Swiss-Prot record:
Name of the molecule in the record: U3 small nucleolar ribonucleoprotein protein mpp10
Residue ranges with Basic residues bias: 235-248, 529-543
Entry function: Component of the U3 small nucleolar ribonucleoprotein. Required for the early cleavages at sites A0, A1 and A2 during 18S ribosomal pre-RNA processing.
Residue numbers carrying Phosphoserine: S268, S269, S286, S293
Family classification: Belongs to the MPP10 family.
Main location: nucleus
Bias (Basic and acidic residues) ranges: 544-554
Region of interest (Disordered), residue spans: 76-151, 183-274, 284-303, 499-598
Presence of keyword Transcription: no
Taxonomy, superkingdom: Eukaryota
Keyword line: Nucleus, Phosphoprotein, Ribonucleoprotein, Ribosome biogenesis, rRNA processing
Length: 598
């Protein structure tokens, strides 16, 4: 074990899953034999879906309530009172003081650690079933007292011991190494023997052990199971003081030599505890407990300490309760009463601010009134009555037409031009509408007058004659195209197509346009030729279409021709009567010269 500690001490710094599993199973077995009080929040241990550490926390919490519920037991053994937790019942053995000191120190360490975990103590020892204890291997399993009685050590209740590791042997070897270090002066009894600012690499170079890991004498219980609580340390010190007081008041030793030896052992154990506390403070001390002066620190350490202090201040400010002004929108319930009276607020409002009525503004207004009265300056606005009431004229009302105008822009310009050119005779739409209304009024009035006359007379009153305007024109009825000079002949009035009519013989190479003018193909340009070809193709297409339609309607045409010969009349959709006529009997008018366009 010592070789393993010196070679690879870091193996004990990491938890072993198998050992932790055995520890939890053994603890559950012990928990099943203990009666848990009703005040405990945990009555059953839940293991499904939880790891060993969570199960261990449940067991520790349940054991705490179970230990508090047990009665106190007085132990007369002074070594049990001194060490606070032990498995010995009689310590009057006549073994050697050195062996007794080693065993007591070893038990002190084990029991103090178990008490810190919450699974040991005088109360818990009574509840643990003897069947749940395991045999401890090694020569340290049994110790003989003065009367030769064999006392069994505390059982391994947590399953830490296996074929390779034994917690008792480990504690003994650790204490032995610590004693050797104390004797050699490595660990002194005074605090001055430890230099807090020393370089730890210096001792590592001088050490015979060439391993890079931590030394065996520096490995503590806290390296495996975490630091002890302050309550556990205070309870341990209290029990130590009580044991010392009882030891001084109870002269139960056989001789002074034995008493001196035991006192020396107690002092050595106290010194060892003090040494352990100093080493623990050196390892786990915080920045607040560092008493090193600022002169002995380097510039980097001073900057680091200053930065740490700033971080602590900022963290404290962040965690502390903030004022209501720093908590966002605060209502009346979220701030103290009358807290707005001492605060200047800036807020936006949509209304016009009311002027503040101060003493200065009041005095200024009073002085202004007094000065006006003294100078008799009464420049108020004089009252005046309206001269005349404006006359309402409906004709001046403007009627806006919301509908879109139906007239074109040319008609608008035409109307505007007529209005400017003939201002006297021009009549707008409003004037025309007004005249129409006047005519309607006159017609209604004449009808009313005639009705009144017929009622007042004894005879029939005929309707008044209506005045009709007829325009008689004395001018000769001559059309413009018929007016010709008397000396001119009819030949001069003919159109070109009437003068020249190409016959079928001399029509080759000539084309008659729509206007009737003949043009030669040599005189035609490319566009005119394309237009002629399109016209010819269109003419042939229409002819073919007519022939196809004629063939389709040959039966219908025959029936219609038969009906037309018989002078049959047919009533149409509008109720009119018409004779049936075939397409062959339709009238084709003859085009004369008067119907041709120039």
């Amino acid at each position: 074990m010592t070789e393993l500690i010196n070679s690879e001490p870091t193996l004990f710094l990491f938890p072993n899953k198998e050992d932790s599993k055995q520890l939890v199973e053994k603890a559950i077995e012990v928990f099943s034999n203990i009666k848990i009080p009703s005040t405990s929040p945990i009555q059953t241990i839940v293991t499904k879906g939880l790891d060993n550490w969570q199960i261990y926390n449940q067991l520790a919490l349940a054991a705490k309530y179970a230990l508090d519920d047990l009665p106190q037991v007085d132990v007369e053994n002074e070594d049990e009172e001194e060490d606070s937790i032990t498995s010995f019942q009689d310590e009057d053995d006549e073994t050697s003081h050195q062996e007794l000191s080693d065993n007591s120190e070893m038990n002190n360490r084990d029991d103090a650690d178990d008490e810190f975990l919450g699974f040991s103590g005088p109360e818990n020892l009574e509840d643990v079933d003897e069947s749940s204890a395991e045999d401890v291997s090694g020569d340290e399993a049994e110790i003989m007292n003065e009367e030769g009685q064999q006392i069994e050590q505390k059982k391994d209740a947590f399953g830490l011991n296996d074929g390779f590791f034994d917690i008792d042997n480990f504690n003994k070897q650790t204490l032995a190494l610590e004693e050797e270090a104390v004797e050699e002066g490595v660990l002194g009894d005074e605090d001055d023997g430890i230099d807090l600012l020393m370089d730890p690499d210096e001792n590592m170079e001088d050490s015979e052990d060439e391993s890079n890991g931590p030394q065996a004498d520096s490995i503590m219980y806290e390296d495996f199971f975490g630091p002890k609580t302050a309550a556990g340390r205070r309870e341990l010190k209290k029990k130590k003081a009580e044991s010392k007081r009882k030891r001084t008041s109870k002269p139960d030793f056989k001789n002074d030599v034995q008493q001196n030896v035991i006192e020396e052992n107690n002092e050595s154990s106290d010194n060892e505890y003090a040494t352990f506390d100093r080493v623990k403070k050196d390892l786990f001390a915080s920045d607040e407990e560092d008493d090193v002066s600022a002169d002995q620190l380097s510039s980097y350490e001073r900057d680091k300490a200053r930065l740490t202090q700033q971080i602590r201040e900022l963290e404290a400010e962040n965690v502390a309760k903030k004022s209501w002004t720093m908590m966002g929108e605060a209502t009346s319930k979220g701030r103290p009463s009358n807290s707005l009276l001492d605060v200047d607020l800036e807020f936006e409002t949509g209304a016009k601010p009311v002027p503040v009525q101060t003493e200065e503004t009041t005095e200024t207004l009073e002085d202004l009134i007094k000065n006006r009265i003294i100078s008799k300056t009464f420049d108020d606005v004089p009252k005046r009555a309206p001269v005349a009431v404006t006359e309402f004229r409906p004709s001046e009302l403007f009627e806006l037409n919301e509908n879109k105008s139906q007239r074109s822009l040319a008609e608008e310009y035409e109307e505007e031009f007529l209005k400017k050119s003939n201002a006297d005779t021009y009549k707008s739409e409003a004037d025309k509408k007004k005249e129409k209304e006047h005519e309607e009024i006159k017609a209604l009035f004449s009808e009313v007058s005639r009705t009144l006359d017929s009622l007042a007379s004894w005879h029939y009153v005929p309707p008044p004659p209506e005045s009709t305007v007829e325009i008689v024109s004395n001018a000769p009825t001559l059309a413009m195209e018929d007016v010709q000079p008397t000396a001119a002949s009819d030949t001069m009035a003919l159109a070109p197509q009437e003068v020249y009519k190409p016959s079928n013989e001399n029509r080759e190479g000539e084309t008659i346009t729509r206007s009737g003018i003949a043009i030669s193909s040599t005189e035609m340009d490319h566009q005119q030729k394309q237009a002629r070809r399109r016209r010819v193709r269109r003419k042939h297409a229409e002819k073919r279409k007519q022939m196809a339609e004629k063939r389709r309607n040959s039966g219908t045409e025959q029936v219609v021709r038969q009906l037309s010969k018989s002078n049959v009349e047919v009533i149409g959709k509008g109720g009119e009567r018409k004779k049936v006529a075939s397409n062959s009997n339709k009238y084709h008018p003859i085009v004369s010269s008067n119907q041709l366009k120039l």
